[in-house]
Design a protein with these regions (language model features):
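Well-ordered alpha-helical segments embedded in enzymatic catalytic cores
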Residues: 7, 71, 233-237
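Extreme N-terminal starter segment of soluble prokaryotic enzymes
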Residues: 1-4, 27
């Protein structure tokens, strides 16, 4: 039995998660995320699509952030016809995020075409995918509950465990069944949450012992403050801003981070540490 692993994104960088696990020469893809950054660089890297779409046995999606699911419609557009395995929450969130991306790309194309016409230049940029590609992609999803084993490909069994990152996020154990020797367990962390988050469960630690771990390390070199310390700091900032009759703008991811901030503001209001003010999202 031969197992080969390589990454096509999120290696020495943060976005564009794509990890390929080849088992006896047959590739399985873990995540198919979009690169993010400056418009030109991200567009170039997203179009340099080095995945053999028609050869993939399956896709395993760890969670629905754009840098993990954003290029699934492009994968389908390029000929991928097999199953995409994810939790039901990840499936539903990914649908919203991929549809939103398709609409943004359409608006970008319309805007850029107008700008090119004003300058008298030729325009040949097109979106990576459209809404019809997203619909086709959603038809290939197979949803799996946590702690349920399922064969994703011949001799390849997957099982999801709560990663505690966002709704539906999953640590993924891939068990490669070897009839001639011991099985091999390969654990993909996806994006891993931390304990004590207010609206997301703690990461599951009741996993089978892995032989290999593919671990994300975005915050691997830092310690996070406790939630109580964050609340006190947030209350201080809001109180100071109110005294100065100012406004607070908080850039936050639409999925999980924004909901967590609203939760914190509600807690502060209930504890009378903050006046009830207008919050717009």
């Amino acid at each position: 039995m031969g197992i080969t692993f390589y990454s096509l994104g999120a290696a020495q960088e943060v976005t564009g998660s794509k990890h390929v696990l080849e088992i006896n020469g047959v590739p399985l893809l873990v995540d198919c995320g979009a690169f993010q950054g400056t418009r030109a660089e991200a567009d170039r890297k997203n179009r340099e699509f080095a995945i053999p779409a028609e050869k993939l046995s399956a896709v395993v999606l760890t969670h629905a952030h754009y840098d993990h699911c954003g290029l699934l419609p492009l994968l389908v557009k390029k000929g991928f016809k097999q199953n995409i395995f994810a939790t039901s929450a990840t499936r539903d969130l990914a649908n919203l995020i991929m549809m939103d991306s398709a609409r943004i790309q359409k608006r970008d194309a319309e805007y850029l075409e107008k700008q090119a016409k004003k300058r008298g230049e030729a325009f040949n940029w097109c979106p990576l995918f459209d809404e019809s590609d997203v619909v086709k992609t959603m038809n290939q999803f197979v949803s799996i509950s946590y702690n349920r084993k399922l064969f994703a490909a011949p001799n390849v069994e997957i099982e999801f465990f709560d990663a505690g990152h966002i709704l539906g996020s999953a640590l993924t154990n891939i068990r490669v069944i070897n009839e001639k020797s011991e099985d091999v367990n390969i654990l993909f962390s996806g994006d891993l949450g931390r304990q004590g988050k207010p609206i997301i469960r703690n990461p599951d630690t009741t996993l089978p012992p892995p032989d290999y771990i593919v671990l994300e390390s975005t915050y691997g070199d830092r310690l996070h403050d406790h939630a109580d310390a964050v609340l006190d700091e947030l209350a201080f900032i809001v109180h100071r801003c109110v005294e100065k009759k100012g406004k607070i703008i908080i850039p936050a991811f639409a999925v999980e981070r924004t909901q967590e901030l609203i939760y914190y503001f509600n807690i502060l209001t209930m504890q009378r540490k903050m006046r009830c003010s207008a919050i717009q999202t």
